[in-house]
């Protein structure tokens, strides 16, 4: 419950008190009795209803006249006595710093009362001060912050606080000020004693006495006390250099005095509050013993009232650093402790003597002393430039209040010479500090000696006369003052030009800055001061509106030079900041915290795109551990999700060739190609099953990876369309200039290749040698730096070789990989013909694309060396696969026997079989059981999936061939076999490579297909064209001998035996293969294979090259198919043996056909049996021209 108001205490505690004692009429007493009853009735009401009534009552405001409902008689009855009269009362706003309080003031002839108006129309006394302890002043800006109307305000204070009292009108303000000053002086005349001893302590001042006791009068101000104490302490200087502080027991910390306070009243008030004086003397003027003031020394230190003299520069620093001093009696919130800003003032570099000049001092010094060669100090110029730049865009500039502590801290920094970054300060703080600087110029910037002349300017006739008068007065000012005025009015003019947005017209600016520009030389009456203030405001308004005519047009360009310097400095700081971030681009924190719209994004364009540090901006960190290990290269199609599929086809070609020319590592062993992760591929060839893998293409790229050969023009083009996403993309997705040159050189080769193929289709001429020769020349010129990579496939790359893919692919994706035109594509399905024409017509029809993949894998191997090793290790055989190898060995031996039988009969593989097999090199390598030169089924560098067990088994199986040039010695470790095979293949000469094709083996096969193909009748025409595009070497005819001459006769015999073989194979039920990765059954594919087996046997089909399906996770494949291989092997073996037995009787009559048929059939059967889980199976028939088809 609230404490009782004074009138309630009086009336309630003394109900029989006579009204005559209060000095109030009985009528008033009756009214007070009614008031008492009303108050008591309110207290008896319930709390909710009372609160509701209070909420609905109108809150009093300063501008309102005293409410008639507020009855002051009861309140005054406790204050008025026989010798005390009420002079005036009214409402006013008391402001201290940023705090504003509405109070009701009562002025008696000897007492000043401040009361708070309560909502129940009662008063609560907040302060009761003797007039002899009070003071008044006009320094409104020193006490209050913000927009204070000096016309209606003045400073009012008592020990030891200062307030800005604002009244409803200037008349009210003048009336209150005159009454206060008059009765304060009257009460001071009654003081006794008129003077008291005052002890002054010197602090932070060297070479002076510690303390001195001086005698002060009751009318001496703080500045006058400073002037008296300086010589007694042995200090030279003026009161502006020092400040007087008060340390009393009532305050937690010393309080600085502005200069207009009365130390006499402060000490006497403290004595009365300390109960040193008699109780009767507190409210009276009874004299007391002169020795009693000296009893202050006997009090505890915390109760003593001490006056401390400090340098003025230290005074502000002490106030900032001392957290114990609470200006507004408010504690700092512990919640915001992280945002507390401590003072950065350095107090250790102070001069030892106060008389020596203080370096860096700025405030309170005349302009000629701080301006060297009439140039403004840098802090002042920086503030003016900042205000000129930000002020026109700030609403209420120079008018809105600023934080007092921030202003004092900035002022101290500027005054101490510390470099200050104004960008970190509020614009209002800077404006307030600038006004403070102008206010501290001795004699004002317009010179107080010319005050009367300045005020009389506005009395001139017209504007011309006023301007001439102003210019004559400016000539009388020091040059430094004129320079500052030119800059100052340039800023004010610029702000005034934008008054529509900042609401600061010339009049508003003049009202705010006039008190800081000109003031009278001596104090005068309030009436005169108000009149002079109005005239000065009108003068400043006139100067702002006519500054261009007074100071010249050039004041608008004064800040251009400063602006250029500042812009240069800002750019330098931005560049240093950007380089600092770049120097630590290996940090994951910088990568994670990087925003696409960061400030450095604009700076990137300024710096140009040639910087190597751009790679840290354009790559992703590999911190993302939850992403799959499938990696690849980014293409623009990954960014532009809105473009059509046709656009996607057109965009893929220029991007896919980027790594071919820029990502070359010459000293990496060739066998390392096989270590590439099986899922690495360009997104252009990713199938639907690998769509998710493509999305994480460059996700694991290290941010510290150097950028390699990217072009500024390409980077700028990409940034224009993919501004945000490109920052996280890899520069590998950019087409380099080398690719463009490569395409230009390739165009004539393409035309020549097409012409040759057309001729071959008409005449049947073998053009493979010419194509291989041209192809070899081109590869040597374009990729000679790759060393063994170039020598590996000279003259022997058939047309069907394309960029290897390491992810499961559909038939549609497989068809996209063909590097030749659709007219020469022997197995391109019709539904992909249109897609092939666009991106592939510009490539030479006989050009192998395996070299591109070699370079890509070489590049990827350099980046993912650790992950390749991990992938290779993960590609180890499971226990089931080891058993599978044992079964495979036995099948190899049996297959070899069948081959030997065919060799005994003298049947050689003809030219057609070699031609047919060479065209199948587009498919991934798989296990092959081939006659004679089966060594060529080894997985080619850069195309064999790392850790592929079946691909390695192909190498192991090929060692059994009698005529193989390269024979691995181990089959226990498929991975080792693959590497050994590749090491051997590096050393093969072109002749051996060509010989492998003629003898029926497809050279370095490219692991391309990812689905089990089946035969389609409608692709026979395409196969015919591809048959003639096979690369052959003349030396192969020498090795084959007579068998090569009999090759054409075998075709007719094979046709005759074809119907009979179909009947033999038809009863065989289709073997049920394991489910394919694509989820489509392969029964149809196997049925077609079995159906076509006799046909191929009759026609002398060459050994089939099968491809191992590439899988991104080898363990999944092995686990998925481990249960099916054995049953499938046995079924196919039985089929093979039965076919062999039916064909064998006819071998005696035919010199080569039946053994050849037997060899072919056995080769096909064992091949399928040994690799039941392999993805695609390609069976090529020259005569029937069957094409493999994905299921």
UniProtKB/Swiss-Prot annotation:
Mark the residues carrying the PTM Phosphoserine.
Answer: 46, 704, 730
Show which residues constitute the signal peptide: none
Q: What Pfam families does the record point to?
A: RA, RHG20_PH, RhoGAP
UniProt name for this protein: Rho GTPase-activating protein 20
Q: Tell me which residues are marked as the site Arginine finger.
A: 399
Which Gene Ontology BP annotations are present? regulation of Rho protein signal transduction; regulation of small GTPase mediated signal transduction; signal transduction
InterPro entries for this protein: ARHGAP20-like_RhoGAP, ARHGAP20_PH, ARHGAP20_RA, PH-like_dom_sf, PH_domain, RA_dom, Rho_GTPase_activation_prot, RhoGAP_dom
Q: Low complexity composition bias: which ranges?
A: 934-961
Task: Please state every residue range assigned to the domain named Rho-GAP.
Answer: 365-551
A molecular-function term among this protein's GO annotations: GTPase activator activity
**Source organism (scientific name):** Homo sapiens
Q: What is the lineage of its organism?
A: Eukaryota, Metazoa, Chordata, Craniata, Vertebrata
As for what it does, the entry says: GTPase activator for the Rho-type GTPases by converting them to an inactive GDP-bound state.
Instruction: Provide ranges: composition bias, Basic and acidic residues.
Output: 1182-1191
């Amino acid at each position: 419950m609230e404490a009782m108001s004074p009138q309630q205490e009086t009336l309630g505690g003394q109900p029989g008190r006579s009204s005559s004692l209060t000095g109030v009429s009985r009528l008033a007493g009756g009214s007070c009795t009614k008031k008492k009853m009303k108050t008591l009735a309110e207290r008896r009401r319930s709390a909710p209803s009372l609160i509701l009534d209070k909420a609905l009552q109108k809150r009093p405001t300063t501008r309102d006249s005293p409410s008639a409902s507020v009855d002051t008689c009861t309140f005054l009855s406790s204050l008025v006595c026989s010798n005390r009269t009420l002079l005036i009362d009214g409402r006013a706003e008391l402001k201290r710093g940023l705090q504003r309080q509405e109070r009701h003031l009562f002025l008696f002839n000897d007492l000043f009362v401040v009361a708070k108006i309560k909502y129940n129309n009662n008063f609560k006394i907040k302060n009761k001060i003797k007039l002899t302890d009070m003071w008044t002043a006009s320094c409104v800006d020193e006490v209050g912050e913000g927009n204070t109307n000096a016309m209606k305000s003045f400073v009012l204070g008592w020990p030891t606080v200062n307030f800005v009292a604002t009244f409803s009108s200037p008349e009210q303000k003048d009336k209150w000020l005159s009454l206060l000053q008059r009765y304060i002086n009257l009460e001071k005349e009654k003081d006794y004693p008129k003077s008291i001893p005052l002890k002054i302590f010197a602090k932070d001042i060297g070479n002076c006495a510690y303390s001195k006791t001086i005698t002060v009068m009751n009318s001496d101000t703080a500045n006058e006390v400073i002037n008296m104490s300086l010589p007694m302490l042995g200090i030279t200087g003026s009161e502006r250099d020092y400040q007087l502080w008060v340390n009393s027991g009532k305050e937690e910390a010393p309080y600085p005095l502005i200069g207009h306070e009365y130390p006499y009243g402060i000490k006497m008030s403290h004595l009365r509050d300390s109960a040193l004086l008699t109780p009767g003397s507190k409210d009276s003027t009874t004299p007391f013993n002169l020795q009693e003031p000296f009893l202050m020394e006997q009090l505890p230190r915390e109760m003593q009232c001490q006056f401390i003299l400090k340098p003025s520069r230290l005074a502000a620093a002490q106030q900032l650093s001392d957290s114990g001093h609470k200006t507004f009696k408010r504690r700092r919130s512990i919640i915001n402790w992280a945002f507390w800003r401590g003072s950065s003032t350095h107090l250790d570099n102070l001069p030892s003597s106060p008389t020596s000049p203080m370096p860096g001092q700025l405030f309170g010094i005349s302009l000629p002393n701080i301006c060297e060669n009439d140039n403004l100090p840098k802090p002042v110029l920086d503030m003016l430039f900042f205000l000129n730049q930000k002020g026109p865009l700030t609403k209420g500039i120079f008018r809105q209040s600023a934080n007092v502590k921030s202003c004092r801290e900035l002022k101290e920094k500027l005054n101490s010479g510390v470099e200050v970054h104004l960008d970190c300060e509020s614009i209002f703080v800077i404006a307030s500090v600038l006004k403070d600087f102008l206010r501290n110029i001795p004699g004002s910037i317009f010179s107080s000696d010319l005050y009367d002349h300045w005020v009389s300017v506005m009395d001139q006739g017209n504007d011309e006369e006023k301007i001439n008068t102003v210019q004559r007065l400016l000539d009388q000012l020091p040059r430094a003052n004129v320079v500052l005025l030119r800059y100052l009015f340039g800023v004010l003019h610029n702000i005034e030009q934008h008054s529509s947005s900042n609401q600061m017209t010339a009049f508003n600016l003049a009202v705010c800055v006039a008190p800081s520009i000109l003031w009278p030389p001596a104090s005068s009456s309030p009436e005169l001061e108000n009149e002079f203030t109005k005239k000065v405001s009108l003068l400043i308004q006139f100067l702002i509106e006519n500054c261009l005519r007074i100071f010249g047009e050039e004041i608008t360009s004064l800040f251009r030079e400063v602006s250029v310097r500042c812009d240069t400095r800002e750019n330098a700081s931005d560049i240093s900041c950007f380089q600092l971030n770049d120097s630590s681009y290996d940090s994951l924190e910088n990568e994670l915290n990087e925003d696409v719209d960061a400030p450095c994004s604009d700076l990137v364009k300024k710096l140009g795109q040639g910087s190597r540090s751009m790679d840290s901006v354009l790559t992703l960190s590999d911190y993302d551990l939850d992403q799959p290990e499938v990696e690849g290269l980014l293409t623009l199609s990954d960014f532009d999700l809105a473009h059509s599929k046709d656009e996607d086809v057109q965009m893929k070609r220029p991007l896919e060739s980027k790594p071919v020319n820029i990502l070359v590592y010459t000293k990496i062993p060739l066998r390392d190609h096989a270590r590439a992760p099986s899922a690495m591929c360009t997104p252009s060839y990713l199938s639907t099953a690998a769509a998710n893998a493509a999305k994480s293409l460059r996700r694991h790229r290290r941010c510290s990876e150097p950028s390699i050969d990217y072009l500024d023009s390409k980077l700028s083009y990409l940034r224009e369309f993919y501004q945000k996403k490109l920052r996280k993309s890899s520069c590998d997705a950019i087409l380099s200039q080398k690719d463009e040159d490569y395409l230009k050189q390739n165009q004539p080769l393409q035309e020549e290749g097409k012409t040759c193929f057309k001729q071959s289709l008409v005449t049947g001429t073998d053009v493979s040698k010419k194509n291989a020769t041209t192809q070899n020349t081109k590869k040597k010129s374009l990729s000679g730096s790759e060393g063994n990579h170039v020598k590996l496939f000279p003259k022997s790359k058939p047309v069907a070789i394309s960029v290897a893919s390491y992810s499961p692919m559909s038939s549609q994706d497989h068809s996209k990989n063909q590097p030749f035109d659709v007219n020469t594509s022997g197995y391109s399905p019709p539904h992909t013909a249109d897609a092939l024409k666009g991106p592939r017509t510009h490539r030479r029809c006989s050009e192998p694309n395996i070299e591109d993949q070699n370079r890509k894998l070489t590049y990827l191997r350099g980046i993912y060396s650790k992950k390749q090793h991990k992938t290779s290790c993960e590609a180890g055989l499971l226990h089931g696969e080891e058993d599978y190898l044992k079964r495979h060995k036995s099948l190899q031996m049996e297959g070899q026997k069948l081959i030997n039988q065919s060799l005994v009969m003298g049947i050689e593989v003809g030219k057609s079989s070699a031609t047919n097999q060479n065209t199948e090199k587009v498919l991934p390598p798989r296990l092959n059981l081939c006659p004679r030169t089966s060594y060529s089924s080894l997985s080619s560098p850069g195309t064999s999936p790392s850790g592929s067990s079946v691909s390695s088994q192909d190498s192991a199986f090929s060692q059994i061939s009698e005529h193989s040039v390269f024979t691995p010695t181990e089959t226990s470790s498929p991975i080792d076999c693959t590497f050994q095979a590749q090491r051997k293949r590096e050393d093969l000469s072109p002749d051996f490579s060509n010989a492998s094709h003629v003898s029926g083996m497809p050279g370095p096969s490219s692991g391309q297909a990812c689905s089990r193909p089946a035969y389609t009748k409608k692709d026979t025409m395409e196969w015919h064209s591809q048959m003639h595009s096979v690369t052959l070497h003349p030396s192969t005819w020498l090795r084959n001998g007579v068998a090569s001459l009999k090759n054409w006769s075998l075709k007719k015999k094979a046709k005759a035996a074809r119907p009979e073989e179909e009947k033999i194979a038809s009863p065989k039920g289709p073997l049920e293969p394991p489910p394919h990765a694509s989820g489509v059954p392969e029964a149809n594919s196997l049925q077609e294979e079995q159906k076509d087996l006799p046909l191929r046997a009759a026609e002398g089909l060459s050994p089939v090259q099968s491809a191992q399906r590439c899988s991104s996770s080898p363990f999944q494949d092995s686990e998925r198919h481990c249960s099916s291989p054995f049953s499938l092997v046995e079924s196919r073996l039985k089929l093979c043996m039965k076919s062999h037995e039916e064909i064998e009787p006819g071998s005696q009559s035919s010199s080569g056909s039946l053994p050849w048929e037997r060899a072919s059939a056995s080769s096909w059967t064992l091949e399928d049996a040994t690799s039941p889980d392999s993805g695609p199976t390609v069976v090529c028939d020259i005569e029937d021209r069957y094409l493999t088809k994905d299921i």
